[in-house]
From Swiss-Prot:
This is Chloride channel protein CLC-a. Coiled coil: none annotated. GO terms for molecular function: nitrate transmembrane transporter activity; voltage-gated chloride channel activity. It holds the Pfam family CBS. The chain crosses the membrane at residues 88-108, 131-151, 178-198, 206-226, 248-268, 278-298, 328-348, 371-391, 453-473, 478-498, 510-530, 531-551, 730-750. It comes from Arabidopsis thaliana (Mouse-ear cress). Keywords: CBS domain, Chloride, Chloride channel, Ion channel, Ion transport, Membrane, Repeat, Transmembrane, Transmembrane helix, Transport, Voltage-gated channel. The gene is CLC-A. One of its GO terms (cellular component) is chloride channel complex. It comes from the Eukaryota. Gene3D superfamilies: CBS-domain, Clc chloride channel. Residues 1-28 are annotated as: Disordered.
Amino acid sequence: MDEDGNLQISNSNYNGEEEGEDPENNTLNQPLLKRHRTLSSTPLALVGAKVSHIESLDYEINENDLFKHDWRSRSKAQVFQYIFLKWTLACLVGLFTGLIATLINLAVENIAGYKLLAVGYYIAQDRFWTGLMVFTGANLGLTLVATVLVVYFAPTAAGPGIPEIKAYLNGIDTPNMFGFTTMMVKIVGSIGAVAAGLDLGKEGPLVHIGSCIASLLGQGGPDNHRIKWRWLRYFNNDRDRRDLITCGSASGVCAAFRSPVGGVLFALEEVATWWRSALLWRTFFSTAVVVVVLRAFIEICNSGKCGLFGSGGLIMFDVSHVEVRYHAADIIPVTLIGVFGGILGSLYNHLLHKVLRLYNLINQKGKIHKVLLSLGVSLFTSVCLFGLPFLAECKPCDPSIDEICPTNGRSGNFKQFNCPNGYYNDLSTLLLTTNDDAVRNIFSSNTPNEFGMVSLWIFFGLYCILGLITFGIATPSGLFLPIILMGSAYGRMLGTAMGSYTNIDQGLYAVLGAASLMAGSMRMTVSLCVIFLELTNNLLLLPITMFVLLIAKTVGDSFNLSIYEIILHLKGLPFLEANPEPWMRNLTVGELNDAKPPVVTLNGVEKVANIVDVLRNTTHNAFPVLDGADQNTGTELHGLILRAHLVKVLKKRWFLNEKRRTEEWEVREKFTPVELAEREDNFDDVAITSSEMQLYVDLHPLTNTTPYTVVQSMSVAKALVLFRSVGLRHLLVVPKIQASGMSPVIGILTRQDLRAYNILQAFPHLDKHKSGKAR
């Protein structure tokens, strides 16, 4: 961090490029493992646009005496309440996500619609300079609102939010990411940014909004106005909140694309680390509720009760009426689309990585620089969208088409702009409209001559530039729609170039181009395939869409990481990948533990003074609890106790005058499982008198007696798979052979210890051939 608290982004290599060779690598006399420095890490990361202190979540079940008693004593009615509440909250997540998505679409379509109508009025009167001033002024005002809200009220609302959601579901606590203020700023900011014509989508923000709704419902509302309903005590834990947020993220994708199955698969393929069949059902239920809500509002809006909205804002690029015909010869252009998508997607990721580093340097200068950067991008975007159509030639209207040509309204495929009657400006049709309508226009079918090649090249080049410079400014933003716009442009260009040599409609080429670029950048296949099928409502596209997605992902993977992985790396979020690096098999957890400070342990019945000293002088979040040695059994590892539980003991002053074990009823009288699940306790709020320092605490009833342990000879690769698969926060390392007088636990590993980048800092010669992607 610098002096102003801004995070300095790491310069470590993110795509595994070769670095300079160390001359010691060729020396046979060097030891196999050369320890360079102590294993260490930073607990800071960017959450949205805010530098935050990062901790891990407790997804593991804490099997202490209280939990076991609570589990045994639950009645059938309580079990039914728990299950019923799970499904009720899943329904409410879908309901509120659908309602808020409709609100956002209504606002965006009406604000942008009236803005474009005003601009069209001045253009029709040949008052182009006035039209430009109105267009630019409105966009600057909307951008200013979105940016100021993010910069000054909720920095965590910046960006799409999907990388932070991935991190949360991976086990990383992202502070303030799902708060009420963040959600409200995300809603209003998304409306402002998208209505301002910025090259941003509302799809990523909707995923974040759905997750915020899920988190708020699970905890009973905002922190200051939380509902104290006793049923909600069942959800006062990280495991159930994780499941709810998974439902929320799937509902957000469904609300963005009206794709219920695609939303479920997106959550499974992209954001969720841990999955099971019961969660699949609830997630699908949430997305089904979203679709019902959206369908109901579409019926209402189609009757003209939503202003300029209609059904336009609820994205549906319907090409179901298009006859899909392709033959063996079409495999060549389809393959080219996939290859182009992979190459351009990886190139886009690489360039965006550089732009985000540059923006980080600008943002470090202060809040006003963040606002000015957003306004500068908005000004550039507005001038380009309004000015570039003057470069296009006017095209005569085709009398054989059924649509009105030319048009001067807010939508339509044939905008007149500066052309005489009977002619239209094809580039204006793509630029002077909302992003959703631009995609509909470029996806239009049975219109082989609607867009000229020059206009498509200008459109493609512009949105490549806008896609790079817009993402990263301090506004809520999504990547889906900008990538769709770029991909559909080069797809349509290829279809236009093929002309009569192909049987596939140019609009379908645009769909395939959009799919290929998304796969080349985001590296998703199954979920994207289903999303595009539900988006276009044409099942006949399935075979060639699958083919294009597989090629694009394969080509993209050969160059660099996916865009969300790159953003995770830039933000410094300690995300654990599913596949360990190959060199991790050459290192054992015992050797890794040797690079850490000695483990801090507590006795089963511990003195208050010792507990206070440990909490004051360490930042560890868990401590092994040992029972004293005797001649027959030696030292026993009783379990693991969390820092939060120690703080609760001190706050409640559950002290003993003598060193003894407590009875079961004594702990139940003082604590409940619900209290132990809360995470708000802070040691700084604890005040212990000098006389209390000499008292004792029995830690046995609050200790997790079944922590996960690994023997010190296990490879780091195997330990990483276990850590990630089970969703752990702490992993105890035990000796292979416990000698007399030796501690039964030799260390604790956390997610920071298992990150490839951190390991290579302590063991720089492990990765001799740079075979992995150190993060």
